[in-house]
Design a protein with these regions (language model features):
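Alpha-helix N-capping/helix-start residues
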Residues: 14, 31-32, 56, 74, ...
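Conserved AAA+ ATPase small/helical "lid" subdomain
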Residues: 49-105
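An amphipathic alpha-helix signature
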Residues: 31, 35-39, 77, 81, ...
Length: 175
């Protein structure tokens, strides 16, 4: 999709948008970074042949390793479902996210935890990814424009419950 220039392209229907994992809005880089891109483009082009090639089997092996070694607590899954249900029931939401989006976010959460050097998914991981996974899956009611506010409102109570259950578990472990 190219919302700036729709010539020859058409917006996808909502069910087809559900097939994309993330919606990421990118801003232009700052002036200094843009100058650096211009100054180093030949270097990057010349070294592109030296890039390490990753095979399909490498990717599948990494996926298996992450799946086996990065734990997703039941409390994280519960918070995810509760947030989704709140979104679906919110009067500001015309169409909520699908269960498919919940299934798809789980491995993404595991990868983010791995990148952050952990063997478990945290509430912070959920807060980081959820807006990007749900932004294009939730259709707001007419007149409602701020998806992030709606999401924050729907996340508040489940995330507070998650924090309490995590704290309770940590206290029980140290006692």
């Amino acid at each position: 999709q190219n919302p700036l220039d729709l010539v020859g392209t058409y917006p996808l229907p909502t069910p087809q948008l559900d097939r994309f994992l993330f919606k990421i809005t990118m801003a232009h880089i700052d002036r200094d970074a843009e100058l650096q891109v211009l100054d180093t483009w030949q270097q990057r082009r010349d070294h592109s042949q030296e890039a390490v090639k990753v095979s399909r089997s490498d990717i599948l092996a990494a996926r298996r390793t992450i799946d086996e070694q990065v734990h997703i607590a039941q409390a994280i899954k519960t918070a995810l479902v509760d947030i989704s249900r709140r979104l679906r029931d919110d009067e500001r939401v015309l169409q909520g996210n699908s269960t498919r989006s919940l299934v798809l976010i789980l491995p993404a959460l595991q990868v983010l935890a791995t990148l952050r050097g952990r063997a478990y998914v945290s509430a912070e991981d959920l807060e980081t990814l959820l807006p990007h996974v749900l932004a294009h899956r939730v259709e707001l009611a007419p007149g409602i424009a701020d998806f992030n506010k709606v999401l924050r409102d729907c996340m508040r109570e489940p995330m507070e419950h998650l924090a309490r259950s995590t704290l309770k578990k940590a206290t029980a472990t140290t006692a």
